Amino acid sequence: MGRVGLGVAVGCAAVTCAIAAALVARRASARARWRRAVALLREFEEGCATPPARLRQVVDAMVVEMHAGLASDGGSKLKMLLTFVDALPSGSEEGVYYSIDLGGTNFRVLRVQVGAGSVIVNQKVEQQPIPEELTKGTTEGLFNFVALALKNFLEGEDDQDGKMALGFTFSFPVRQISVSSGSLIRWTKGFSIRDTVGRDVAQCLNEALANCGLNVRVTALVNDTVGTLALGHYYDEDTVAAVIIGSGTNACYIERTDAIIKCQGLLTNSGGMVVNMEWGNFWSSHLPRTPYDILLDDETHNRNDQGFEKMISGMYLGEIARLVFHRMAQESDVFGDAADSLSNPFILSTPFLAAIREDDSPDLSEVRRILREHLKIPDAPLKTRRLVVKVCDIVTRRAARLAAAGIVGILKKLGRDGSGAASSGRGRGQPRRTVVAIEGGLYQGYPVFREYLDEALVEILGEEVARNVTLRVTEDGSGVGAALLAAVHSSNRQQQGGPI
């Protein structure tokens, strides 16, 4: 071989070696980036861990906060609001009752006909949007609009003899004064009618109804959680609590009046009262908080509030996963050039998170579609898609298990968790059948979430006690439940309803 040929050969060898070295370096870099993504996943999983021992600590913390909230206003993160609902439907109610459900940009009017034996004979529902200008206008404008809608709804009905009872579900913060009255604390959900704050919203509606010539009055002012409890109790008198787990979350339960220390001397016909916990604001150092939860809290308008809700409700689960993906994109390049799209807050909704977690196809085709179409991440390899599924699973599992701990906290406060003497003072006895009414799209529409919650209940309570606890899905407590409460708390309540 001549010198020229030798030089060419040496040059080719050098180029080949350089290319090989570059490929090796690139593969090593890719492996390092992947290892970083896996490390972030493991770190997140460890931070979200909810072993049974930790869940029991959350249970105990919930009970402590419940006691504190019942002892004094402002003494706990849990508001423990009195509802003045001291009787619940028993299934013996009969007649036709109406309800209005106002809790957002739409409102509903319902006519519910009930028969003895826990039978809903007939139900009619109409939904209407509230014009945006009314959400920022005047009190009279809003309530006159609602009253007129009820008047139009009643036209053609033949059950308008005498004064009619109305249940009013008003899902905004209210300081309850009685079962049929309460003053607005503040507007939420885009409403900003200044002259309503501090006024009795039931009285505002009653005045509007009278102005429309309607012989209708509000006999029960409730929130959606209390309505869910009422509907659950209507079907099953062993129902002692209700939980909503949807875009938001809350719980209420039946408390003995002598345990409500902040209202000494409170008397009811039944000796009990429904307490609205507002448990979304629960907090404890035992909750498994991660750096992503802190980032989420920082980007919300209600910073340092609703800590429990931000861990378990549908409004936030997708965003927690998005924050994890964004950090992975920044530190590992596992998503290629998609870091920009992952920087958009709330781009991943919880329904998409659920669809990702529940994709059981061999190649995770639904995950690939969601990544491509909604997160702008094209051609994610299968191992990346599996990583995405795992993140969504971790978020879901933590949320469901914490929700289960909250439910057990209520049961422990009532002495129904099998731990012996009740915190409310009752002695040890045989396990009693206990029903918790549960409503909300996260529990009803996300089977994996439901399975994790049910599994955690058994882990915390033990199989023997858990056999006596039933979570009963209850639909439309805010509508039908409010109408049933109108029946119980109407002028003929002495013939209807039952002790609680």
Swiss-Prot record:
It is a single-pass membrane protein. Disruption phenotype: Decreased grain length, grain width, and grain filling. Delayed seed germination and retarded seedling growth. Expressed in roots, leaves, flowers, immature seeds and seed coat. Expressed in young shoots, tiller buds, endosperm seven days after fertilization, and interconnecting tissues such as pulvini and nodes. Residues 35-487 form the Hexokinase domain. GO terms for cellular component: cytosol; mitochondrial outer membrane; mitochondrion. Keywords: ATP-binding, Glycolysis, Kinase, Membrane, Mitochondrion, Mitochondrion outer membrane, Nucleotide-binding, Transferase, Transmembrane, Transmembrane helix. It is found in: Mitochondrion outer membrane. Belongs to the hexokinase family. Fructose and glucose phosphorylating enzyme. Involved in the regulation of cell expansion in spikelet hulls, grain size, and gibberellin biosynthesis and homeostasis. This is Hexokinase-3.
